[in-house]
Amino acid sequence: YQHSKEEKSDFQLEAAADMGALMIDGLTDGIWLMNNGDIPAQTIDETAFGILQAARLRTSKTEYISCPGCGRTLYDLRETIAKIKEATKHLKGLKIGIMGCIVNGPGEMADADYGYVGAGPNKVSLYRKQVCVEKNIPQEVAVEHLLALIDADKK
């Protein structure tokens, strides 16, 4: 599909809207994007792979599930999401849930491979699938504990 967009976000939105529905409905299983604007080839490739992953046709990167945070979130959710993404972006095929609280977190991340869920003021619990494997970890070291859990499971 060919686009004529100058802005990355406009290109991504239009490409996803045009191609995503066809893929979800099973009418195609591949994608070729082109752009007549100034969008770099790397962005075009990343967009195509992102659409394929969203349609569950090809996994090419780590996937993250997160809540927007609310009054029950007792740690810096945005900063934590950024830290976890940076530390795990190379783990192709994993799905990691990052949730603000214990109330809705475990249910919202039910299909994640690993979960990072707020447990109290600056405390976090870690999950493997839907099973809590470590409780009330201080937030300052919780990302390292998550990475250690993932590494231990690789062995």
Locate each region found by the language model:
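Short, well-ordered beta-strand core segments
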Residues: G115-Y116
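Catalytic alpha/beta core domains of metabolic enzymes, predominantly
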Residues: Y1-L91, K95-I98
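Domain-level signal for soluble alpha/beta catalytic cores
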Residues: K5, V103-N104, R128, I137
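A C-terminal functional module that forms or caps the active site or interfaces directly
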Residues: V103-D111, G120
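Beta-strand/loop-dominated core regions that host nucleotide or nucleotide-derived cofactor-binding catalytic loops
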Residues: P121-Y127, C132-K154
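Solvent-exposed, flexible loop/coil residues
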Residues: A17, P106-G107, V131, I137
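Short, surface-exposed acidic/glycine-rich loop or hinge patches that mediate macromolecular interfaces
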Residues: D38-I39, V103, E140
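Conserved, mostly hydrophobic/aromatic
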Residues: L22, C67, C101, M109, ...
